[in-house]
Amino acid sequence: MQDDIRFSRPVATAERLGKHADDRHRFLEKRILVTGEREVLATKNGRACLLFGLRLLLRICPNIVVSLPKECAILLDECHAAIDPLTFGGDIIYLDNPGNLAEYDAIFCIGATARPGLPWTVVNSQGWIARVSSGSTHLSADCQLGNPIGALAAASLGVAEVFKRLVRLRASRGQLLDGLSFSLYDYTVGATDPSPSLPERLPVQLLFVGAGAIGNGVVQLLSQMPLTGHIWVVDSQRFGPENLETCLLIGPEDVGKEKAVFAADILNLNASLEARGFTEKLDVFSGRLGKELLSFDLINGTFLPGLMPRLGLRGVSRRFLIKVSAS
């Protein structure tokens, strides 16, 4: 499993930690329990934290057990439908009774209660706030204000905590978080204000370049936002097996698919959006922008002029460009 290209990047990350991670050579053999509290799982944020968390966890560990409260049968069915097709290292095991909790190497819980006597990380979210605790501090159980941004952040922080446990990261290199509450709205620690609700409608005219690892996460969020309008996705590549470990939307059946077209298909599940994928490099796309794109059904008479300044193409201002890099 250590040599499996599908896990090569988590393995490389663990290796780079060196002596700071005692189990860097064994973490893929370990076992994770995913569970939750009924009250939090019943919220929109709780559901999102669970599904986001599972999408991420299966990229770093092939041995996952899911055990949810019996009242969560519908959510369990959703896990089977949305998550099972994405697995590639091993099938997720679903149990009514998880057994001895101390036998798990890490426990990822969607809830509010901390359990410091176990390898337990609890997460939830409220609006723009992401919460996580791997120590003795309980979290607020107020999770009613739905926002996929806060939910994905909470799940991501929680999965990072799980990874620390799997590799047995020494505290001198990275301590476990205890009762963190972080606002994605104003970037404050200890946040209690969930900040504004998302609007009911977000009009966009967006050029989206790069639908790989980071792009996959952004597409996941965009697909759950109340967007209307048009999105162009540009990426010249297809998914390879090495992308399974970093792209939270894809499973084995998606290897070989064009990244841009795949992203557009996800976005088009929102009937208020029109998205189109272009499997080409940005310079090729921009070189024919003013020629061929006018003929696409996607474009209307007001869209192209509004997009041009944002692209920063043909000498037009670049002040609207945004770049995100993993390096």
Task: For the regions a language model picked out, list residue spans one by one.
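Adenine nucleotide-associated cytosolic modules
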Residues: 1-327
